[in-house]
From Swiss-Prot:
Belongs to the SecE/SEC61-gamma family. This is Protein translocase subunit SecE. Keywords: Cell membrane, Membrane, Protein transport, Translocation, Transmembrane, Transmembrane helix, Transport. It comes from the Archaea. Gene3D superfamilies: Preprotein translocase SecE subunit. The keyword Transcription does not apply.
Length: 59
């Protein structure tokens, strides 16, 4: 398969994905953003606790 054929197929795939995809509703988008921020905060807190624990144990 040539490079030009691959690019053509890739472009067709992108068109198909865009035609099938739909824009999320405002409520769904807000919920996804809140959930993402919550998970990031939890991971950050866990990382801080681990770092603090290691620092106190090594000090």
């Amino acid at each position: 398969m040539s490079l030009s054929q691959r690019l053509k197929n890739l472009r067709e795939d992108w068109k198909r994905i865009i035609s099938v995809a739909k824009k999320p509703e405002k409520d769904t988008l807000n919920q996804s953003i809140k959930l993402t921020l919550l998970v990031m905060a939890i991971v950050g807190i866990i990382a801080y606790i681990i770092q603090l624990t290691v620092a106190l144990l090594l000090h």
